[in-house]
UniProtKB/Swiss-Prot annotation:
Family: Belongs to the Psb30/Ycf12 family.
Name of the protein described by the UniProt record: Photosystem II reaction center protein Psb30
GO cellular component: chloroplast thylakoid membrane; photosystem II
Entry's transmembrane regions: 5-25
Oligomeric form and interacting partners: PSII is composed of 1 copy each of membrane proteins PsbA, PsbB, PsbC, PsbD, PsbE, PsbF, PsbH, PsbI, PsbJ, PsbK, PsbL, PsbM, PsbT, PsbX, PsbY, PsbZ, Psb30/Ycf12, peripheral proteins of the oxygen-evolving complex and a large number of cofactors. It forms dimeric complexes.
GO BP of this protein: photosynthesis
Membrane topology designation: Single-pass membrane protein
Role noted for this protein: A core subunit of photosystem II (PSII), probably helps stabilize the reaction center.
Subcellular location: Plastid, Chloroplast thylakoid membrane
Length: 33
């Protein structure tokens, strides 16, 4: 495992995890307002 591969996998995981989190946060904020 090279450092570049680890960085690429990490960035992909961050994007995949950030997608649903952003949607949930937006829905929660709209619900509270």
């Amino acid at each position: 495992m090279s450092l570049e591969v680890i960085l690429q996998l990490g960035s992909i995981l961050l994007v995949v995890a950030a997608g649903p989190l952003v949607i949930v946060l937006l829905s929660v904020n709209e619900g509270n307002l």
